[in-house]
Amino acid sequence: MLFRSLDRTFVDGRPVDVQEEIVWERPFCNLIRFARDLPASAPPQPKLLIVAPMSGHYATLLRGTVESFLPHFDVYVTDWTDARMVPVALGTFDLDDYIDYLIDICRALGADGAPVHTLGVCQPSVPLIAAVAVMERAGDPASPASMTLMGGPIDTRRSPTAVNTLAERRGPDWFARNCIVRVPFPYPGFGREVYPGFLQLSGFMAMNLDRHVNAHLEMFHHLVEGDGDSAEKHREFYDEYMAVMDLDAAYYLQTVETVFVRHALPKGEMRHRGELVDLSTIRRAALMTVEGEKDDISGVGQTQAAIDLCVNIPQERKRHYLQLGVGHYGIFNGSRFRKEIAPRIREFISDAGRVRARSAKSGEVVA
């Protein structure tokens, strides 16, 4: 079981067993469903696709995110494969492939006609909104009913952070020369060019060193004071935070250039398989953006930019929420997320589902 301890949840106040199922597979991703043992008479709950970041950490970093939504949704999460474990013969993986994967997953989940709601945590915000734009332009019936973008770099020109400034100043060529290595023997991906996860982790840790030291001190204080729950939650999060994976070099370098150097998406210059990604084609999906006041990875306003760029989504189906007092990881993990952010996302998805259901019943297209 990938997500340890997520073997039970509560639905309508009753304990329900949970099992992980792999329902879709590709070389660089498995789609995990958290199948709940609900009675046959239970009404179906909305499908929620949580797109985990491909940024050096495993999907298990989202344990708290998944746990918060399990009582209310049929939850799926992308489990990205460590690039060092993918044989070179299976090809590379770039930003175009990422978007293709998300489109294929949405089609697989929407095959039964039920609406699919999507949630992109941090880095996936760009490929997710691009995938929705591609699907809506094509009139794809499986295009999501809603998308929630959390702490994502939609437009890094707004409130640029140290991460954004470094990427723009160095440029993709510098990263290619200094950060790309080949997977060593005896890993299955021997010879594959990758951006190693330990570089990402060391960069984040150095950026927030005082915060991490203080967090560990607080954990030990909790242990001394007998606050076992808080200390244990902190320990679990750090176990996941310290576990890192390698990224395919093609994806990493294309992301640096497209998102952080050229700002191609907000400029209307981003392409997928040679075709422009036009966010004005998005009309049917509802949109919510979530940011953290103290986020030093995706600055305030970077995710909210999606609200301005999606000009043809009616204003009443667009929402933005800024959570005070939290940084990047507090957007999707911790007590503020559970008490303040998750309930707002649930309400947003519920409203979006009702709009899509009314549209389907009347035979009209939401616009």
Features from the language model and the residues they span:
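Conserved acidic catalytic loop of the alpha/beta-hydrolase fold
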Residues: 85-89, 99-116, 128-133
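Conserved alpha/beta-hydrolase "nucleophile elbow" surrounding the catalytic nucleophile
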Residues: 119-121, 125, 292
